[in-house]
UniProtKB/Swiss-Prot annotation:
GO molecular function, one term: 1,4-alpha-oligoglucan phosphorylase activity
Keywords of the record: Glycosyltransferase, Transferase
Reactions the enzyme catalyzes: thymidine + phosphate = 2-deoxy-alpha-D-ribose 1-phosphate + thymine
Protein name: Putative thymidine phosphorylase
Gene source species: Bradyrhizobium sp. (strain BTAi1 / ATCC BAA-1182)
Cross-referenced InterPro entries: Glycosyl_Trfase_fam3, Glycosyl_Trfase_fam3_N_dom, Glycosyl_Trfase_fam3_N_dom_sf, Nuc_phospho_transferase, PYNP-like_C_sf, PYNP_C, Pyrmidine_PPase_CS, Thym_Pase_Put
Family assignment from sequence similarity: Belongs to the thymidine/pyrimidine-nucleoside phosphorylase family. Type 2 subfamily.
BP term (GO), one: pyrimidine nucleoside metabolic process
Length: 511
């Protein structure tokens, strides 16, 4: 221990049952010997030291000795994991020196263009949890005002290089990604087994929900374990040609996960940040060919074909600079895909499609076949234009279902009981007519209000889609909840706005 450290008061580390998300937080008593009012105040940034380990964290001060005593320092659960020193160990606390890269953040706020080196330094500090959420927000807001093509390339490269980088022996490694915003739409879980059954390599790393009722990882977790590390992932892909796992556990582009956790609550969703976010993860995952799905609709992330075209050009530009073959398609984003919204309901849709069940959602089946067809045609041995027929053969024959079961077995079948919520209510049409519009944002919010994705059995089962005729009092959808309080909140939310629009005739005036 250095002379400086030995002069500072030693505080005993205590585990505090606080989940502070991605931010490191430490708590000390107002009566602590280490608390000097002229140096420390609430929400100060501090540096914790123990042996050769250091940790930057946000400081909270408490008057409750039951939480931490005067000779203790409490670490939130994320901070305790990252510091990797056990409770009971002694550590010192001192004012933190701000990361040098914060000067680049200030420059960006002033409207300056950042160098590759400056962007790399910011991302490195982000990935090592040296920034507070406020400092991350400052970087995001500064970048949202403008970003040059050079900065976008530098940001993508830095984010891809910040975490695990996967390499595969196969010359063609395919992947697909949707920019999100459409309820249901669980095409990846149908596409992966189709493509893997054909023999192409498709190591799918997926996200968990942040503002939606379910991410692909949340839905796959109903069926199988998704917290899989990089080496185990490689073994699964070697055995099955594919997987569907949570990308966060593999540590692909960790800076992106941190940025997303701050930008989503602020509703910051710039096109440049989206491109860097998606492509950095695909580059880190070792993909050679990427199919991008851009849904377009009134309540989708993209509301017009012109918006989609601008985003498409940006994806293709960045992909080309990194040697990644990027194909972009626009799809119908006017309404949910599939009948279920929420992890259990979406998983049931997926297995119904793979099992060729009579009641399987036709829109999920058809969209999945179209996407799989594009990916299959990256196989040089497959005749051009034959992708759709091959995808349908693999689905109809049961080969895709068999491959999905193989992937589930390799990842490890889920051990949790995932049942639908037992508190349910129907939302009914208030008039006769034809469904002319469905608000995707509204249904996403309603499913989250019902408890998804935390409660995997919460969500919405749709009975009516655009173009369907309804009679007054006929159910539009059923909402499932697992908790009485969430049930009451969902009832109130649905009563305020059920998210459906009606017309008297097909393509008629909406009311």
């Amino acid at each position: 221990m250095s002379t400086i450290d030995s002069a500072r008061p030693q505080l005993k580390i205590r585990s505090v049952a606080l989940d502070t998300g991605r931010e490191n937080v430490v708590v000390i008593s107002r009566r602590s010997r280490a608390l000097r009012p002229e140096v420390f105040s609430g929400f100060s940034r501090v540096e914790l030291r123990c042996n050769s380990r250091t940790l930057l964290a946000t400081l909270l001060i408490t008057d409750d000795d039951a939480l931490v005593g005067p000779d203790e320092i409490g670490l939130s659960q994320p901070a305790l994991r990252r510091f990797a020193e056990p409770a009971g160990t002694f550590a010192t606390v001192s004012p933190a020196t701000p990361p040098d890269s914060l000067e680049a953040v200030r420059a960006k706020i002033r409207g300056e263009t950042l160098s590759d080196q400056a962007i790399s330094a910011v991302i490195d500090d982000l990935a090592h949890y040296r920034y507070s959420d406020m400092e991350i927000a400052a970087f995001l807001i500064g970048s949202a005002s403008f970003m040059t093509s050079g900065e976008l390339l530098a940001l993508t490269r830095a984010m891809a290089n910040a975490g695990t980088q996967l390499k595969w022996p196969e010359p063609v490694v395919v992947d697909k990604h949707c920019i999100g915003g459409i309820p249901g739409n669980r095409t990846s879980m149908v596409v992966v087994p189709i493509v893997a059954a054909h023999g192409l390599t498709i190591p799918k790393t997926s996200s968990r929900a942040i503002t939606s009722p379910a991410g692909t990882a949340d839905t796959m977790e109903v069926l199988a374990r998704v917290n899989v590390g990089a080496e185990e992932m490689k073994s699964i892909v070697a055995a099955c040609n594919g997987c569907v796992i949570w990308g966060g556990h593999v540590n692909l582009s960790p800076a992106d996960d941190i940025l997303i956790s701050v930008e989503r609550p602020l509703s910051l969703d710039t096109r440049e940040q989206m491109v860097a976010s998606i492509l950095s993860k695909k580059l880190a995952a070792g993909s050679t060919h990427l199919l991008l799905d851009l849904p377009v609709g009134p309540t989708a992330k993209l509301s017009s074909g012109a918006e989609a075209m601008r985003l498409r050009k940006l994806f293709e530009f960045v992909g080309d600079r990194f040697g990644l073959n990027v194909e972009v398609i626009t799809t119908d984003g006017r309404q949910p895909i599939g009948n279920g919204i929420g992890p259990v309901l979406e998983a049931r849709d997926v297995m119904a499609v793979l099992g060729n069940e009579p009641g399987a959602p036709a829109d999920l089946r058809e969209k999945s076949l179209r996407l799989a067809a594009h990916l299959l045609e990256y196989d040089p041995k497959l005749r051009g234009g034959a992708g759709y027929q091959r995808a349908r053969e693999l689905l109809d024959s049961g080969a895709a279902l068999k491959q999905m079961q193989k992937i589930i077995d390799a990842q490890g079948p889920t051990t949790s009981r995932n049942e639908l919520g037992d508190l349910a209510f129907d939302v009914k049409a208030g008039r006769d007519g034809i469904v002319s519009a469905i608000d995707c944002l509204r249904l996403n919010r309603l499913a989250r209000t019902a408890g998804a994705p935390i409660n995997k059995g919460a969500g919405i089962r749709l009975f009516k889609k655009i173009g369907d005729r309804v009679d007054q009092g006929e159910p539009l959808y059923r909402v499932f909840t697992c908790d009485p309080s969430e049930h009451d909140l969902a009832v109130a939310a649905a009563a305020a706005d059920h998210g459906y629009g009606f017309a008297d005739e097909p393509n008629g005036h909406q009311r």
